[in-house]
């Protein structure tokens, strides 16, 4: 190797070249005389002849040889001739820049990987000599380390390559045959692929899941494997077994001071490092459970009874478990206190694992053998009976022991005479005869009953019956029904009828089940089927949610009925049948949610029974009861209430909110959303908001009509004091007014806004008409409709009248419409103006034709200010003011300033009209805007008269009628764009201010630049000096250029001249485009 390396290293160092020029040197023709080709490639190479045929495969082959030349892939040794060594030297003397080589991306990647590998080797110190850093490790390391696998890092790369991998191990032809078998070593890295393949079988990681870490199915296989290993090791370790036994004993004692043996764990861990093995005590604890569970438990003697049981306090019986196999009991793997079976406040004695769910949670009360001489009743203990029959012997004593408060299962017949307060299960029926009638009532029935009581018809001896089927005594004075009954109780037979009259027992307040018969008390809240009431002193359920059965009468006499009034179910949610009740003092359900049937009442106490305040479903049947003033109707009736008899003297309380059709006996609801039947309504019972069509009311009282009526109401025989709806959107029929005509003279308000057609009625009523709807009785003048004159004296006209008003009324002080867009018909009376009203106002904006019936005595009647039609002639009105802006023919009562009608003597001339010329001298105001040629009087002329005005005061007269003025055309010589010495404004024929008709009148020529020689006042400032005009020369704005140098004309010397000057000397900017 020394000779080879010295030959390479002793070669002269060439200058650095680019990488592409180095690649080009591989593709040069070897026949050419180039030093680089002579050095690198020689004719004795086996693949030198292929370079002349420049096909694709040879190019790829050369690139491959170039890439693997320095990566120790070939097994040829370096020869003495440097030409035979395919070594990539990044630096030649070739100065020509090679063309771009079509190298594949994968080839470029592999070249970069090769450079990276050399750089990593240099950093790791694997390359000993850094004199020639371009020479790869195949030259330096030599052949002392050979590869065992014969492969290379690049050949075994998983990167796809277009070059076959067989070329990696191809040998090159060398001179010495003994060096052909020399292979280049493989460079070792920190993460070698071969080393990773070697440890794949040993370092397989465990698959983690969401399960618990200790999976029993996993450790069963491990345990079998360990047993085989233990059988192979015959001797074993005695210390390990002793330690495990000590651990077991410590676990059973509740002491975990000693840990598992580490030597056994190391042996177990040798098999698999990643297996997280458990020790044998841990596996026994997981598989077999705690030692206290497996160990025998001494059976509790029957004679051993705790003192707490004798005292009556609730206790829990410890379960007796038989001896079982070790492997039979497997407890769950997750637990907090499963090692020692100690009772803690949060953990009691663990029950049997193989027992059923009912047996696990069953805890019954053991009734101890108490002293027979003791007669005191025990306190009720908390017991939960989940349908489990405890076979207990009956105590023969007559004491009254405590019972369970909550009964969730079948009823356990104990020796107690009181039923369970809370019944959640199926309780048996009370069918046995209670022999001891003199027993004191010291216990109560279950308050909550959630089960179905069993019907037990046999009345055998209690000795032969189990505890669950023992019945309670039937004495009603000592037993009460459960407050909450959630089940269906069976028929409860009563044998002691004499005892049923002693004490009043309350029925269950809340009955959630369907009971057939109820012997003692009616529940307050009944959610099921109501049982038959067998006691006359029992109160009905206040809240009934189910269907109550018919109540049976007891055999007691009515005289024995207590006078106490028991309430009926206040809230009835079910359908109750007819109850033959003796104790009629029971109250009716206040909230009735169901359809109640007939309730036969035969007692005078039933007068205090209250009707259901809230009745939701169907229509109840008529209650046959003597009507009383204290009988309450449902306040909120969501159904159709029953019809009361006609014997009701006073008015009952009716529902305020009725959502269904009600009968005639009820008052009209405040909000009626349905169709109500025709009924006799008391006063003040009409609906305020009626969304339907109310029936015809035949009452002679004064009902209040709805304020807002959205529908069409039928005819109502209402009185004069009935208030009409303020806002009426429909078209109600005319209501018949039954009042006298004298009441119509009162002050009556008309509708503010009426958008419909009113009926032509002459009836007098104080009822105002509807707002959006035709009135029924009285028709004041509408706002936006066609009014009909009422016969009343105080009917006011509407402010905005868009229709044609009928003037056949005789109202005295009626005000005309301010904005009347119609032509009112002529009336025969004093409709528009009255004899008595001196402040009558005529139509201000009367677009239509106003009335011609102006009163003769009216002196202050104002005419229409903006009358756009021909108004009627006034009768004898001398100074009546007519419309100021009347564009039609004005009446004789006064002239409209905007009319061209014939004016009277003292009337104003029309403002925009053409009044005929009169000889009168007392014309007040001249026609201000007379466009039709007014022959003016000496009093004043038209201001804007454009046709033939002879008045001197007319400023903008179109033509001049005076003979001494010269009729100069307006736009002849004084046109705008011609040079002139006179102004261009000629409105009144003044001829440019030359002829001045008025001495002191300011002429327009003085204002708009006339010269001083025009005859104007000399002391007036000449505007021509202000606006640039010379003395005596007017300013010509856009005419020909004048001689004055300061004129703003369009001359040749001005800046604004288009011929030359600034604009002529200005160059035009051009867009210069650069050549592209």
Curated annotation (Swiss-Prot):
Ranges of the FXFG repeats in the UniProt entry: 406-409, 422-425, 448-451, 484-487, 510-513, 525-528, 543-546, 571-574, 671-674, 708-711, 727-730, 800-803, 885-888
Keywords: Acetylation, Membrane, mRNA transport, Nuclear pore complex, Nucleus, Phosphoprotein, Protein transport, Repeat, Translocation, Transport
Statement: the UniProt record of this protein carries the keyword rRNA-binding: no
Ranges of biased composition (kind: Low complexity): 1-11, 708-723, 965-979
Modification N-acetylserine occurs at: 2
Residues carrying Phosphoserine: 54, 161, 383, 637
Region ranges (Disordered): 1-39, 143-183, 224-260, 403-518, 548-743, 940-979, 1025-1054
Modified residues (Phosphothreonine): 381
Intervals holding FXF repeats: 336-338, 384-386, 591-593, 614-616, 636-638, 657-659, 689-691, 753-755, 819-821, 866-868, 929-931
Compartments, record wording: Nucleus, Nuclear pore complex; Nucleus membrane
GO biological process, one term: poly(A)+ mRNA export from nucleus
Sequence ranges of Basic and acidic residues compositional bias: 426-439, 488-505
UniProt feature, compositional bias: Polar residues: 19-30, 154-170, 243-260, 634-649, 658-667, 944-964, 1034-1045
FG repeat residues: 1008-1009, 1027-1028, 1038-1039
Annotated stretches, region: Interaction with KAP95: 1040-1076
Its membrane topology: Peripheral membrane protein
Any one GO cellular component localisation term in the record: nuclear pore
Additional record remark: Present with 468 molecules/cell in log phase SD medium.
Subunit structure: Component of the nuclear pore complex (NPC). NPC constitutes the exclusive means of nucleocytoplasmic transport. NPCs allow the passive diffusion of ions and small molecules and the active, nuclear transport receptor-mediated bidirectional transport of macromolecules such as proteins, RNAs, ribonucleoparticles (RNPs), and ribosomal subunits across the nuclear envelope. Due to its 8-fold rotational symmetry, all subunits are present with 8 copies or multiples thereof. Interacts through its FG repeats with nuclear transport receptors. Binds to the nuclear basket of the NPC through NUP60.
Domain notes: Contains FG repeats. FG repeats are interaction sites for karyopherins (importins, exportins) and form probably an affinity gradient, guiding the transport proteins unidirectionally with their cargo through the NPC. FG repeat regions are highly flexible and lack ordered secondary structure. The overall conservation of FG repeats regarding exact sequence, spacing, and repeat unit length is limited.
General function of this protein: Functions as a component of the nuclear pore complex (NPC). NPC components, collectively referred to as nucleoporins (NUPs), can play the role of both NPC structural components and of docking or interaction partners for transiently associated nuclear transport factors. Active directional transport is assured by both, a Phe-Gly (FG) repeat affinity gradient for these transport factors across the NPC and a transport cofactor concentration gradient across the nuclear envelope (GSP1 and GSP2 GTPases associated predominantly with GTP in the nucleus, with GDP in the cytoplasm).
Name under which the protein is recorded: Nucleoporin NUP1
Gene name for this UniProt entry: NUP1
